[in-house]
Amino acid sequence: MSKTPLSIAHPWHGPVLTRDDYESLCCYIEITPADSVKFELDKETGILKVDRPQKFSNFCPCLYGLLPKTYCGDLSGEYSGQQSNRENIKGDGDPLDICVLTEKNITQGNILLQARPIGGIRILDSEEADDKIIAVLEDDLVYGNIEDISECPGTVLDMIQHYFLTYKATPESLIQAKPAKIEIVGLYGKKEAQKVIRLAHEDYCNLFM
């Protein structure tokens, strides 16, 4: 009997993103609030790698990762530019990022979970679209009933926005008030989040299929 080599599906290319028109999403988690190291999926191998230690006091306040079979390319960049009233905005060339809210103490990354999108944060990083979709863990006892970002506690959204505004900043740049490369254009709700996801999924299909 011949032996079949064992293989593991690539977290970016293997899982099915959605089976119900973006109401529920498969999410790959890279970072948890317990991590003092920034982990990142290696796009070539599909292995979770150390990107860099967290240099300063910033810790991601939520589960953070990516959406399988998404890519921030031309369609994503064009839409971000339209909504931001900016020209020449491009996609950042990465899978679409996702932040997952849960009251559970999940301390391990490199996992898949199901979450429902409730909105997103429109971010420009060096004039590239770098949106963060906000979602809630399915059946979560605290966040599970939230349907739209407008129902999310403001303090939670403030913490997430503060993290992404400052996690790349140095104390020197903050003290000297140097212009930030990262800009939060605004928040948007569930319906627009689903459109952002759909465009990123189309970008992925255009690139890989």
UniProtKB/Swiss-Prot annotation:
Mg(2+) 1 binds at D92, D97, D130. Mg(2+) 2 binds at D97. It catalyses: diphosphate + H2O = 2 phosphate + H(+). The keyword Cell wall biogenesis/degradation does not apply. Pfam families: Pyrophosphatase. GO terms for molecular function: inorganic diphosphate phosphatase activity; magnesium ion binding. Substrate binds at K38, R52, Y64, Y167. Gene3D superfamilies: Inorganic pyrophosphatase. GO terms for biological process: phosphate-containing compound metabolic process. Its cofactor is Mg(2+). Keywords: Cytoplasm, Hydrolase, Magnesium, Metal-binding. Transmembrane segments: none annotated. GO terms for cellular component: cytosol. The keyword Hydrolase applies. InterPro entries: Pyrophosphatase (IPR008162), Pyrophosphatase_sf (IPR036649). It is found in: Cytoplasm. PROSITE patterns: PPASE. Belongs to the PPase family. Catalyzes the hydrolysis of inorganic pyrophosphate (PPi) forming two phosphate ions. NCBIfam families: PRK00642.1. Homohexamer. This is Inorganic pyrophosphatase. The gene is ppa.
